[in-house]
Amino acid sequence: MIKANEYRTVTCGELREENIGQQVRVAGWVENIRDHGGVMFLDIRDQYGVLQVVVHNDELLKDINKECTVTLSGTVVKRDEETINKKIATGFVEVHTEDIKVLGKCKNVLPFEVATSTNTNEEVILKYLFLDLRNPKVHNNIMIRSQIITFLRNKMNEMGFMEIQTPILSTSSPEGARDYLIPSRKHKGRFYALPQAPQIFKQLLMVSGFDRYFQIAPCFRDEDARADRSPGEFYQLDFEMAFATQEDVFAVAEEVLYETFKKFSNKEVSKPPFARIPYAESMLKYGTDKPDLRNPLVIVEISDMFEETDFAPFRKKTVRSINVPNAAGQSKKWFKKMEEFALSIGMKGLGYVKVRDDLTFDGPIDKFLKEGDREELISRNGSKAGDVIYFIADTAQEAPKLAGQIRTEVAKRLDLIDTSRFEMCFIVDFPMFERDEETNQIIFTHNPFSMPQGGLDSLLNKDPEEVLAYQYDIVCNGVELSSGAVRNHDIEIMKKAFELAGYSEDDLKAKFSALYNAFQYGAPPHAGMAPGVDRMIMLLTEEENIREVIAFPMNSNAQDLLLGSPGEVTEQQLREVHIKLR
């Protein structure tokens, strides 16, 4: 596995019974020290595994403590039957040594036990990341990350994509999240920006005649952290294809994601083709554009049934229902907990009915139902005896989201989600535009550079809020892995789209001059997407927080506690970039 040198001839993870009797030298960290009646046992750890070492002369251990680094030589010996450890690969052998040398001393008091570092306060972990990364579980996540990225890179090469690096020093974009800005020393008052994504560069590559581009792209966004979003930077498998349709992109994404998830997980994975779910359908049936399809519960539109109701909470509201199979037997406490959850997310209450054996209803909403409503509800929801029907009513904007949260919470509380599989889908047919609630102006919903469905004709003749775009997301188990689009490569369509969103042609020239100019010199139709590498690894390692799959993550407040970033700089450094702090 390694080339022999003065520190080691083998690694701690490779010795087996066939090595018994051999003289070896190993090096690593002292994971544990145990005294068994004058015979000392050490567990020595390196990246490749753990090896038990036996020391009969305790004088050899006078300078040795946990987590110091050592090199030692000795003889490989078969373990006694009662000491065999089948939990580790080297568990049938041990090394007996009379020669140990300390290579790197370690303080006697550790800030936390390496083996249990994941249970330690986050701030302490991030200050001593080099210790946390020794934890085998954490260490393994980073090794898996390396393997996954290597696999992705090889797969893209195999599929004919060319890896091209795009600039890290770029210009600020008027769209998207906040930029990280870098002041220029040579150009007073001007700033570079770290790219939020290689969006414009990869489109320019298509105009430049490159047919299939990809890179494992670093992206930088000044946005708040979440469990599935690292503050500061993240990585994408960014790819773009010339002369390509939406289905061409889907075919590439399906092959890459299916093979990656099959290789690095034992779970069942959706087989291509993945489900295509229109955005409007997803918002109706699942209450989100990031549906977890492992959850069997479905939301149903029932607003029309309550248009003339006397029940004030439903009057002139968007009303949705969720049928929960076999839930009628749940305790009063269970229903109370669900109501408390509903209140915690901003609902004024959570109405429901239980379906009796004779298909009549029992519950607080029943008395507000008209003749025929019960049969209609049972029909629309597919309800059976013993089921529960929940009701969610609110504004047209809020009701879908609230229903989606109730759907998810009920499934979690009843353990309805099948955790043994990865369920992937594409969300398609996103609206191109939406109306800003504060200004009432038409704005882009997502990517302003996507192609509207129907082209220029739809922009000229449709209500902007009815125009759909060739935009799409990939979702896996309720986590958005990627967004993408067929790009708008036609300058006339682009001008009209931006005009509808309140941009003049001069604005377009000023803010997006590179694309505006390039698209006047023969731009090909092109499309692409960018699956999030960190999120993929998070799912494959079954970690709940993205920090656990990043070697040097920031804390939730966007601070690097190990290096002290962001940090102060000198007055001289500020003068060089023409900045004065106030």
Regions found by a protein language model. Give the residues of each.
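Class II aminoacyl-tRNA synthetase catalytic cores and aaRS-like
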Residues: 1-582
